[in-house]
């Protein structure tokens, strides 16, 4: 079997070598001293053959929200989340980024562009939360503090190296539910963050 494999590999190598050598279809002679050769090549339409995998959270859970007794101070509920560049191949890190954007599922440019969780049994009960691309929300601004200017969402992070991880925070101010009849707003809430990734120049 080893001998057969060796012969097969040798023949395959010979065929590959032959396919890469130019074919002599014309000759120059003392009576015909000029000739032409067509030079051919192919450029792939794939943009640099870049491939990547950005891993986003499946679920982010605030857990149990508690109605505060007063709203004289903030009552934040924070939960961390991660977005990771699991794989990056072929990216020119000196000139290119993989940019990740995020928006609420119902957000629109020029319209309502904040992030919300909504009561699963009552679509009229929605409460806003904030998205940070840092683990220090007290010393930075939420990405949704400004208006959303692109349909793909707010710019969240730029990746150029495989393995890079962005850890951020979702923040819910429990003052949002202060003053409500708790029996009227009780229940399960959910919302969806829509992520978008694209290769862009730095």
Please describe what each predicted stretch is.
Residues 3-6, 83, 97, 151:
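Intrinsic disorder/low-complexity segments enriched in polar/small residues
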Residues 1-25:
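Sec-dependent N-terminal signal peptides of Gram-positive bacterial secreted proteins and lipoproteins
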Residues 24-124, 160-202:
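N-terminal small/polar-rich segments of proteins
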Residues 102, 127-129, 152:
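Generic hydrophobic, helix-prone segments enriched in Leu/Val/Ile
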Residues 108-146:
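A surface/secretory-pathway sequence property marking extracellular, secreted
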Residues 137-165:
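Extracellular adhesion/glycan-binding regions together with long Ser/Thr-
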């Amino acid at each position: 079997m080893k001998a057969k494999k060796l012969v097969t590999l040798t023949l395959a190598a010979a065929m590959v070598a032959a396919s890469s050598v130019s074919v002599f279809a014309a000759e120059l002679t003392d009576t015909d001293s000029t000739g032409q050769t067509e030079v051919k090549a192919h450029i792939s339409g794939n943009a640099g053959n870049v491939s990547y995998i950005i891993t986003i959270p499946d679920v982010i859970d605030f857990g149990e929200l508690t109605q505060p007794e007063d709203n004289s101070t903030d009552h934040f509920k924070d939960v961390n989340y991660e977005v990771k560049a699991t794989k990056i191949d072929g990216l020119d890190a000196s000139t290119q980024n993989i940019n990740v954007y995020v928006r609420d599922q119902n957000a629109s440019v020029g319209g309502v562009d904040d992030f919300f969780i909504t009561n699963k049994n009552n679509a009229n009960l929605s409460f806003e939360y904030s998205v940070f691309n840092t683990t220090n929300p007290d010393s930075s601004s939420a990405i949704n503090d400004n208006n959303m200017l692109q349909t793909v969402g707010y710019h969240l992070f730029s990746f150029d190296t495989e393995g890079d991880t962005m850890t951020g925070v979702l923040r819910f101010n429990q003052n949002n539910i202060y003053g409500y009849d708790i029996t009227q707003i009780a229940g399960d809430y959910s919302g969806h963050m829509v992520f978008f990734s694209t290769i862009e120049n730095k």
